[in-house]
Amino acid sequence: MGKLRQIAFYGKGGIGKSTTSQNTLAALVEMGQKILIVGCDPKADSTRLILNTKLQDTVLHLAAEAGSVEDLEVEDVVKIGYKGIKCTEAGGPEPGVGCAGRGVITAINFLEENGAYDDVDYVSYDVLGDVVCGGFAMPIRENKAQEIYIVMSGEMMALYAANNIAKGILKYANSGGVRLGGLICNERKTDRELELAEALAAKLGCKMIHFVPRNNVVQHAELRRETVIQYDPTCSQAQEYRELARKIHENSGKGVIPTPITMEELEEMLMDFGIMQSEEDREKQIAEMEAAMKA
């Protein structure tokens, strides 16, 4: 067994990050890799396609029931899923109460201290990326995750979140070993999406690892709480995830310290691609619409 690789999938909520990560990890386990998934998203949906179940009980929830995290055994919080993948969910507090990142910190420390990281080739963190607050940045900040893969699309907010996550990586890159592995574009069928993803990757100084095409088979598999790899292993989408897994596997040690851009540069890039209008164009369009309404 080689050196443990600690990777993380970051991305804005609703981008398909958990789906992408679970399908990729299912493909990695087919390649003979031993994997532990640590879900760090308050939705706690980072393992359901691997376990083929409803949401897994979280470390925080189980700790609250048991009295404290010290009262738990690893077997209580780690479940075994597809082809032996180990799964755990950190969890978070009730909405509006406390810091969701606290669960991430508690869970990772508990898992490490109790041997959950032994005998695996990969630990994969699935992390919410709209907010790179202290808690959610914890896998980066505490030098746990070494390679970050940002799941994004051609939509403006996904690009904005990707750039923000790159800023978070840059902040901790010099003090720790964290690097940006690259971007994964989840197709949303927006205009010039692949070009835009490649342009952002170039600005950030990283690779566009893979462009995952949109395919309804993903939703069909999700309804059965399965990855595409398990649901329809011979379909073209399963091959896309295998290709993505291969690229990540071969990307070891090739991460970069990113070069995030300013909001102005991001808006300029969107204007160049015709995604966003300039202030003058916008005002002109509003004036034309108002004139048409009066006519």
UniProtKB/Swiss-Prot annotation:
Chain positions recorded as [4Fe-4S] cluster binding sites: 99, 133
Gene Ontology terms: biological process: nitrogen fixation
Organism of provenance: Rhodobacter capsulatus (strain ATCC BAA-309 / NBRC 16581 / SB1003)
PTM characteristics: The reversible ADP-ribosylation of Arg-102 inactivates the nitrogenase reductase and regulates nitrogenase activity.
Job description of the protein: The key enzymatic reactions in nitrogen fixation are catalyzed by the nitrogenase complex, which has 2 components: the iron protein and the molybdenum-iron protein.
Requisite cofactors: [4Fe-4S] cluster
Protein's recorded name: Nitrogenase iron protein 1
Family the entry assigns: Belongs to the NifH/BchL/ChlL family.
NCBIfam families with a match to the protein in the record: nifH
Keyword Membrane: no
Self-association state and partner proteins as the record states: Homodimer.
Entry keyword set: 4Fe-4S, ADP-ribosylation, ATP-binding, Iron, Iron-sulfur, Metal-binding, Nitrogen fixation, Nucleotide-binding, Oxidoreductase
MF GO annotations: 4 iron, 4 sulfur cluster binding; ATP binding; metal ion binding; nitrogenase activity
Reaction it catalyzes: N2 + 8 reduced [2Fe-2S]-[ferredoxin] + 16 ATP + 16 H2O = H2 + 8 oxidized [2Fe-2S]-[ferredoxin] + 2 NH4(+) + 16 ADP + 16 phosphate + 6 H(+)
Enzyme Commission number: 1.18.6.1
UniProt cross-references to CDD domains, sorted A to Z: NifH
Taxonomic lineage: Bacteria, Pseudomonadati, Pseudomonadota, Alphaproteobacteria, Rhodobacterales
